[in-house]
UniProtKB/Swiss-Prot annotation:
This is Stress-activated protein kinase JNK. PROSITE patterns: MAPK, PROTEIN_KINASE_DOM, PROTEIN_KINASE_ST. Dually phosphorylated on Thr-179 and Tyr-181, which activates the enzyme. Belongs to the protein kinase superfamily. CMGC Ser/Thr protein kinase family. MAP kinase subfamily. It catalyses: L-seryl-[protein] + ATP = O-phospho-L-seryl-[protein] + ADP + H(+); L-threonyl-[protein] + ATP = O-phospho-L-threonyl-[protein] + ADP + H(+). Residues 22-317 form the Protein kinase domain. Responds to activation by environmental stress and pro-inflammatory cytokines by phosphorylating a number of transcription factors, and thus regulates transcriptional activity. ATP binds at residues 29-34, 51.
Amino acid sequence: MSSSDYYSQRVGDTVFTVQKRYTNLTNIGSGAQGVVCSAFDTVTQEKIAIKKLVKPFQNETYAKRAFRELRLMKMVDHKNIIGLKNLFTPAKSLDDFQDVYIVMELMDANLCRVIGIELDHDRMSYLLYQLLCGIKHLHSAGIIHRDLKPSNIVVKEDCSLKILDFGLARTADQTFNMTPYVVTRYYRAPEVIVGMKYKENVDIWSVGCIFAEMIRGDILLPGKDYIDQWNKVTQVLGTPPSVFFKQLSSSVRLYCESQPRYAGKSWKDLFPDDVFPNDTPEDKAKTRHGRDLLSKMLQIDPQNRITVEQALAHPYVSIWYDPAEVHAPPPKRYDHALDEQSIPLDQWKTRIYEEVKTYNS
């Protein structure tokens, strides 16, 4: 495309330079990684979302995250994961390359808007089922999301749900003692907090925290900082047995074992009947199933925590079970060897430019 195929428009505090096919640009949100607007695609005749990555080459961390996000969005195709519709830059050469624009499906709201709204069991379990289907699809490619939270789960009025934002995803065959700050604190699994190695069911803890928030209407474990988050986990759910602490590094183990021991609250106290929908006789059984699923997701020791496959087979969500959704053909396994390399920033810029330019070629 030539420069005449693009136009510029200020959206909030950001200038978008987009293809002329996209009109009616309206600001809908922003974050550390980008600014998002809604628009109308005159070619496909549908409303879409356009995300402009903010300064993707300002440092190696931002560049790696942008590279991961683009590669993952290009390879993943599932109804419960946000779909990539277009990828472009107005730059004509690598020297001019500064901005990346990602065109995605447009949803109505993120899950933050849903929390606090009274939902019946059917809607709640259907949202949960879709979230688990999306996670299962990622896990089938060996991808752990690592950053699940209400703000990066989006929904439509018809109750359809999609996961977005993959910048923190990592393959499951790499067991890392990774930074405790990869996940928004409230949804961070215990094994992340204490620096243990972790695998796929780290995402299931996050789902449990989100599910709990949908039911209760408030954050289950609102830690003020890194240490307080661990303390909240043990105060609410109980101090884990000594076998758990044997897996920790000596310094972390020393701290954890020096803290008061807590019995924790019962699941019935944490999730009493009156926080669940209980309008019909059938609701009572669904409430029991919902509480049971929470108890299996929110296990401090990941060895005791339910897997995504087990969660999908649980009575609370299995009423929606569709093999075509649960066992959708997995993408090829994602190779993180590229984005784990430490290379000069200009080489990251080249890689990202190539990802953008090869999208429509």
